[in-house]
Amino acid sequence: MAKRPYRVEVNYPKDKKPRYFLVKDVWFKGKKSKIKKSLGTNPPSEDDIKRYTDEFAFEIEFKVAEKKAEFSSNMFNFDYLNLEKVKEIERLRFLYKTFTELLTTNEIEAYEQSFEINYVQGTTSIEGNTFSLQEARDLLVDGIIPKDKPLREINEIQNFKKVKQYRDNYKGKVTIEFIKNLHYMIMDNIDYESAGIFRRTDDIVITGCDLQVAPSLLIEDDLTLIINEYYSSIENNKYTFEQAVLFHYKFEMIHPFADGNGRVGREIFNYMLNRENYPKLLFLGDDREMYIKSLKYGNKDEFEPMVKMFVNLILSQRYEILIKNLRKVVIPQKRGGQMRLTDFDNM
């Protein structure tokens, strides 16, 4: 758990009493600033400083995130979003980073477990899995298998235990091998013959899409191309979130596998976000319609509304809940020990 490095600063206005401020310095890639909160004209005692720190911690941390978002958003080149929308996403990124840095190791495990349950239930439900959120939790956490569920659906949920372990331990770039390994784990015990293997047929149709997928002979070449395009764009300061959305769409249109493309594509998308300290996107059943609609914009080469819908999804899912959860951890004396899985608001 990271400490909040606040300090007290005193200003001496001419012909006026000294004024005291609680200050946090802000540094981001060579740029610096500071956030100040006035404490009045009386010198604060150690007890005062502790009380002010707890009282103003959330306000200061929020303003720090805003300042870093201002710095970072001006460093990117973006094609489909305006500056204000980019600042919103960047503010979310830095609030999320602050939140996770304030958690203890046990609290991070509880938070990530809660997110993973929501994520797995959502990403599989998009593909037709009928597990409820509680049933997914019972299976993933307690190993309780619900009655009357098909073996395929059970394996679809359980396979994400291996996916999470692999994803969390992997620290490299997205590669062909990484993509195949994800698919193998996602489809293990479901489709033995094709798990981890690119499709060999072109007789593939994407439901609700009139466009043709990549020819099977070109799958690896096309994937290599979009992987290289993604990392080249990031190196040239293209906006990460935009580029991750575009990669996700291109991946789905290549459709490299006979089945499981959506689950693999969403894993890669969130991996790209998480590598750059953005919170992951939940693909909840309730958001299925908006998610599918956004990809359909891409089919018409209307990438601006597609990217904006992804932005709206992550902001609507994560921002308000992140604010609530940050308030819970930013003031230590009100936490009452380690936070539990149930202490966090829904992801």
Where in the sequence are the language-model features?
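FIC/Doc superfamily catalytic core
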Residues: 1-259, 263-347
